[in-house]
């Protein structure tokens, strides 16, 4: 019995010494890939959306910071993955870079367009809106407001 145990012990020593062979050395592994967001699509009725901010007398925008009434608008997104979504608006910034410049600066040189979230807080240009939950069908409606804002006194 002792001889059998001794033989097993010697066998284990021989096996363990085999595992302690020379190390493999340095191995370099380069991994490449891309991770992309699954994005929503804009409802076809909202792709070329026009939001009419109205016609206002210059007396409505006499001083810097004066605004016109808020005009609501919404964007409908479809085919979204489960979870929540947010969007951001880009465009030509006004002198206050949180606001959108008008296309025709001769029209109103001291006026810009202000965007607001559904809670009416300002949505700065280039910043993500608050998130909205996607419904079970992959749809979500994002609600916003827009208005004119005077950048300085003496709107022309």
Residues covered by each model-derived region:
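Mature extracellular/passenger domains of Gram-negative fimbrial/pilin and adhesin proteins
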Residues: 2-4, 19-156
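Bacterial N-terminal signal peptides
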Residues: 7-16
């Amino acid at each position: 019995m002792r001889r059998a145990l001794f033989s097993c012990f010697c066998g284990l020593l021989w096996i363990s010494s085999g595992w302690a062979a020379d190390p493999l050395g340095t191995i370099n592994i380069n991994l490449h890939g891309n991770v992309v967001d699954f994005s929503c699509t804009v409802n076809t009725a909202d792709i070329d959306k026009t939001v009419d901010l109205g016609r206002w007398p210059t007396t409505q925008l006499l001083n810097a910071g004066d605004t016109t009434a808020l005009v609501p608008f919404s964007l409908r997104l479809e085919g979204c993955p489960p979870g929540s979504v947010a969007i951001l608006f880009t465009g030509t910034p006004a002198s206050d870079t949180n606001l959108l410049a008008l296309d025709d600066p001769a029209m109103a040189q001291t006026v810009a367009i202000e965007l607001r979230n559904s809670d009416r807080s300002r949505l700065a240009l280039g910043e993500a809106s608050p998130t909205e939950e996607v419904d079970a069908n992959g749809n979500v409606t994002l609600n916003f407001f827009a208005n004119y804002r005077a950048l300085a006194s003496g709107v022309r």
